[in-house]
Swiss-Prot record:
NCBIfam families: Ac_CoA_lig_AcsA, PRK00174.1. PROSITE patterns: AMP_BINDING (PS00455). The modification N6-acetyllysine is found at residue 609. Keywords: Acetylation, ATP-binding, Ligase, Magnesium, Metal-binding, Nucleotide-binding. This is Acetyl-coenzyme A synthetase. Catalyzes the conversion of acetate into acetyl-CoA (AcCoA), an essential intermediate at the junction of anabolic and catabolic pathways. AcsA undergoes a two-step reaction. In the first half reaction, AcsA combines acetate with ATP to form acetyl-adenylate (AcAMP) intermediate. In the second half reaction, it can then transfer the acetyl group from AcAMP to the sulfhydryl group of CoA, forming the product AcCoA. Gene3D superfamilies: 3.30.300.30, N-terminal domain of ligase-like. Its EC number is 6.2.1.1. Its cofactor is Mg(2+). It comes from Rhizobium etli (strain CIAT 652). ATP binds at residues 387-389, 411-416, 500, 515, 526. It holds the Pfam family ACAS_N.
């Protein structure tokens, strides 16, 4: 924990939308009188039918979350149509291609046409309100058009990250029974093609075996690469949009009508379909975007995430566009053609607000300062981080080297489930401590509890819960409300349990310490240990597997796998490589194991439960105090694991 404090810079304070006094006043009202506070701020979006009810939520019993429930609106209308009269010619999306010489600017007028045409294509092929549409796309403007087109006609989109495998894509198609997929011939990442259409074809075959049949696939031509083609099912996007009008009226949606499903890893094997609805989500995404990034009209804003993750939903597409912002969409990677790419893009497009992940910061820090200092970065006003806690060393480098000691670093803590920022500094109001997410956003009531559920006051270390609802909160797990209740509200009754550990210091600042459940945070992406374990066990030579996280210099957390093989088989380096490939094929490259330790047995209690605490300690090369091992069925297993650990500190 860093003791250093960076006060709000004078020039930031002078032009900030929210100062300390306003933050304290608004925050108090937001938690003391949420109906009044959100009743006022709900009007930041346009409503076809104004709401009269604001908050109707319960964290007990059946758990029900409703905001602005009698209002009617449309997300696509709020992100596009309402800006056309005064800002139609303003750039909505700057697209920066994988190739540094290719970019494109799309105005709000052009965005309107693209989205209406895509919406009309969906309607032409039978997609209607409530239908689920799967989007498996690279970071190209058509991915945003697809999301907004679904929102326009009331279809529910399920965006699947383009780095996920066909198996992972199939699982998500099956779970939400999607019959329409939007994809691309190939993606481009770091100069290499990604076979998205071929992956889609494989996924559709897998889904069909589970009785979910995709009837149409809309394919955007990105590279012109060869792909399979199913006549009657597959449609070229460029051909289809040429046949429809560039106008499509937005459907009136109830505030609680579903907007999207986004799958996220849980502590059990099957990913959860996080369901977000229309009104509350957009109010919260747009409000957090404006105040957390101190967004002023005319700012060029760049979030480096992918639309396949919630950060891309809330802070590339919906939040910025609802605020009539100019949002930059980046197809590439931070180290292609070299490690200076981010800083070159900032100079090229005069970016004012830059939002990225600690993993990227640590990786670029390792490449040295020269890549940064050869660029000017003079347009930058604000830096942000997202996805995982940032270590103070990386924070200081980001602040000192990238931001030239003049740009506040906004360290945001939130989740797929929360829809938007929860604990975060506001640039003009909150002094910064490197490594701390600082204080709660308006309407957010954090609480620390110990493992028994006792509430901890003052400076404390515990499990982070939120005690009341906020408009951006997920409403349910798609198709499984019981799982929603069990996952988030059963551990500590009447509270939303985040799954994160947290420390609160004597100034009331919050420091996120990482997951306390069986979920890894690898490069800012959540991954369930159970998912990786089931991928390993699906290999014909693996009898049993246990997966834990360990500290990783770049990724934050690395993936450490303990693998027991079938009788008669020996662990070799070749098999290690084969297992890494196998996991990549089952889930995707983000799940690649960093360390695989072959183990004759795993530490189990007499009842057969694996003692993960011991496995974590060994993976961390910290086995001096393993705690009580008396309940182990075979304590000798531990000695073997220690002797053969893969993470020995080098002398």
């Amino acid at each position: 924990m860093s003791d250093k404090i960076h006060p709000v810079p004078k020039q930031v304070k002078a032009q900030a939308l929210i100062d300390k006094e306003k933050y304290l006043k608004w925050y108090e009202e937001s938690v003391e009188n949420p109906d009044k506070f959100w009743g006022k701020h709900g009007k930041r979006i346009d409503w076809f039918k104004p709401y009269t009810k604001v908050k109707n939520t319960s964290f007990t019993g059946k758990v029900s979350i409703k905001w602005f429930e009698d209002g009617q609106t449309n997300v696509s209308y709020n992100c596009i149509d309402r800006h056309l009269k005064t800002n139609g010619d303003q750039v909505a999306i700057i697209w920066e291609g994988d190739n540094p010489y290719i970019d494109k600017k799309i105005t709000y007028n052009e965005l309107y046409e693209h989205v209406c045409r895509m919406a009309n294509v969906l309607k032409k092929h039978g997609v209607k309100k409530g239908d689920r549409v799967t989007i498996y796309m690279p970071m190209i403007p058509e991915a945003a058009y697809a999301m907004l087109a679904c929102a326009r006609i009331g279809a529910v989109h399920s965006v699947v990250f383009g780095g996920f495998s066909p198996e992972a894509l199939a699982g998500r198609i099956v779970d939400c029974e999607s019959t329409f997929v939007i994809t691309c011939d190939e993606g481009l990442r770091g100069g290499k093609p990604v076979p998205l259409k071929d992956n889609t074809d494989t996924a559709i075959h897998i889904a069909a075996r589970q009785h979910v049949h995709v009837s149409k696939v809309l394919v955007v031509r990105r590279t012109g690469g060869k792909t399979g083609w199913a006549p009657g099912r597959d449609l070229w996007y460029h051909q289809e949009v040429a046949t429809v009008k560039a106008e499509c009226p937005p459907v009136k949606m109830k505030a609680e009508d579903p907007l999207f499903i986004l799958y996220t890893s849980g502590s059990t094997g099957k990913p959860k379909g996080v369901l977000h609805t229309t009104g509350g989500y957009l109010v919260y995404a747009s409000m957090t975007h404006e105040y957390v990034f101190d967004y002023h009209h005319g700012d060029i804003y760049w979030c480096t995430a992918d639309v396949g993750w919630v950060t891309g939903h809330s802070y590339i597409v919906y939040g910025p566009l609802a605020n009539c912002a100019t949002t930059l969409m980046f197809e590439g990677v931070p180290n292609f053609p070299d490690q200076g790419r981010f800083w070159e893009v900032i100079d090229k497009h005069k970016v004012n607000i830059f939002y990225t992940a600690p993993t990227a910061i640590r990786s670029l820090m390792g490449a040295g300062d020269d890549f940064v200092t050869r660029s000017s970065r003079s347009s930058l006003r604000l830096l942000g981080t997202v996805g995982e806690p940032i270590n103070p060393e990386a924070w200081e480098w980001y602040y000192n080297v990238v931001g030239d000691k003049r740009c506040p670093v906004i360290d945001t803590w939130w989740q797929t489930e929360t829809g938007g920022h929860m604990i975060t500094p506001l640039p003009g109001a909150i002094d910064l401590k490197p490594g701390s997410a600082t204080v709660p956003f308006f309407g957010v009531k954090p609480q620390l509890v110990d493992n028994e559920g006792k509430v901890l006051e003052g400076a404390a270390d515990g499990n982070l819960c939120i005690t009341d609802s906020w408009p951006g909160q997920m409403r349910t797990v798609y198709g499984d409300h019981e799982r929603f209740i069990q996952t988030y509200f059963s551990t500590y009754k009447g509270k939303y349990f985040t799954g994160d550990g947290c420390r609160r210091d004597e100034d009331g600042y919050y420091w996120i310490t990482g997951r306390v459940d069986d979920v890894l945070n690898v490069s800012g992406h959540r991954l369930g240990t159970a998912e990786v374990e089931s991928a390993l066990v699906s290999h014909n030579l693996v009898s049993e597997a246990a997966v834990v996280g360990y500290p990783h210099a770049i990724k934050g957390q690395g993936i450490y796998c303990y693998v027991t093989l079938m009788a008669g088989h020996e662990g070799t380096d070749t098999l290690r490589q084969e297992l890494v490939k196998h996991v990549r094929a089952e889930i995707g490259p983000i799940a690649s194991p960093d360390k695989i330790q072959f183990a004759p047995g795993l530490p189990k209690t007499r009842s057969g439960k694996i003692m993960r605490r011991i496995l974590r300690k060994i993976a961390e090369d910290d086995f001096g105090a393993l705690g009580d091992t008396s309940t182990l069925a075979d304590p000798a297993v531990v000695d073997d694991l220690i002797a053969n650990r893969q993470n020995k500190a080098t002398a």
